């Protein structure tokens, strides 16, 4: 399955020193790269991710997901005390669960994002002081910041760690079509309130690429866009 769908590729950003609370990123999908079954993930963190998606049927969505600390591929198996809880959700946002690649809480907004337009996302990660961490995702569109959702993850005490982005095809039938995405203008805000620009990143791919099963992947820097 993973060989047939192609290698997912990632940018792991070099975070500034200190407790990072917010991560800001921008994405541009050009018209020729707006393909079905593609996830243009913008704001990843050690416990989840957020980005825009074009589904297998061509729907456009904004997704924000947080993994449970309980290891399983079936969300039904997660004990109640280890479930990711939703604290808030934005207008027209759907809340659900996901599985198969870990499990946890998920939110999505049906939003007709347009190829050729730059979109912005902001994710906040902050410990609540009671043994859980709160994750909040925002998406900027139509001239305003839209709340996607705010989740609480139990048994977690962390700030924003593991900032990254990825490009993924999730349907093997579409893996023959080349696709790319541009990420730019990455910033993090520390818990102290200071904003720091991210100027470094490391390119990587999943096991499909690292094992040599597929060679049709690449990453590059183009005038501050990656």
Regions found by a protein language model. Give the residues of each.
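Residues that flank catalytic or metal-binding motifs in active/ligand-binding sites
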Residues: 21, 60, 117, 133, ...
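Short beta-strand segments enriched in hydrophobic/aromatic residues
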Residues: 27-31, 68, 125-127, 141, ...
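Carbohydrate-binding surfaces in secreted/extracellular proteins
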Residues: 113-147
